[in-house]
């Protein structure tokens, strides 16, 4: 929990915007992901998630994310529901271990999400992703994403543009 709060604090410096939760629900595509353990987001990696749908319920006390993973060309659909824990807008969910996540900044057509995954072996992975309502980012969105990645302590060379390999169904 402390790691996601530190990640959120660092990344919030890149995303000075406040979160408008009315803009969270909708159809989204993961454009890019960065992680400190980059193998987790490579092709076939368990944290390489292709977002499709995000919904808010109970005043956004719960966020539902529908996404695909692609292992050896086989797309598998997943839906996870994150429950807000506390006042810091941090959500917890079980997927490939224990996860905490937070929407760090958003607009009408893009959002940046930060997460910390602790897998079954106890390995902790910091991750920052950006999703959009189209298949590309504006230069400003790209800049905010890269700044968030740097502020999370993740090298820019660990960014993977996953939209290029998204062959899963809409």
Curated annotation (Swiss-Prot):
Disulfide bonds join 56-60, 75-168. InterPro entries: Calycin (IPR012674), Lipocalin (IPR002345), Lipocln_cytosolic_FA-bd_dom (IPR000566), OBP-like (IPR002448). Expressed in harderian gland (at protein level). Expressed in hair (at protein level). Expressed in submaxillary gland and harderian gland. It is found in: Secreted. GO terms for molecular function: odorant binding; small molecule binding. Its main location: secreted. Belongs to the calycin superfamily. Lipocalin family. This is Lipocalin Cav p 2.0101. It comes from Cavia porcellus (Guinea pig).
């Amino acid at each position: 929990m402390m790691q996601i709060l530190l990640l959120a604090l660092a990344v919030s410096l890149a995303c000075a915007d406040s979160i408008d939760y009315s803009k969270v629900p909708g159809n989204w595509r993961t454009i890019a992901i960065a992680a400190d353990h980059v193998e987790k987001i490579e092709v076939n990696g368990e944290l390489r998630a292709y977002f499709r749908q995000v919904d808010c319920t109970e005043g956004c006390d719960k966020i539902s994310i529908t996404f695909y993973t692609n292992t050896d060309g086989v797309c598998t659909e997943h839906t996870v529901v994150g429950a807000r824990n506390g006042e810091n807008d941090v959500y917890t969910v079980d997927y490939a271990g224990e996860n905490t996540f937070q929407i760090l900044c958003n607009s009408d057509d893009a959002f940046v999400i930060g997460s910390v995954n602790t897998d079954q072996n106890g390995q902790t992975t910091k991750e920052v992703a950006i999703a959009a309502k189209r298949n590309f980012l504006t230069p400003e969105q790209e800049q905010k994403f890269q700044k968030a990645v740097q502020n999370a302590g993740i090298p820019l060379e660990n960014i993977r543009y996953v939209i290029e390999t998204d062959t899963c169904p809409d």
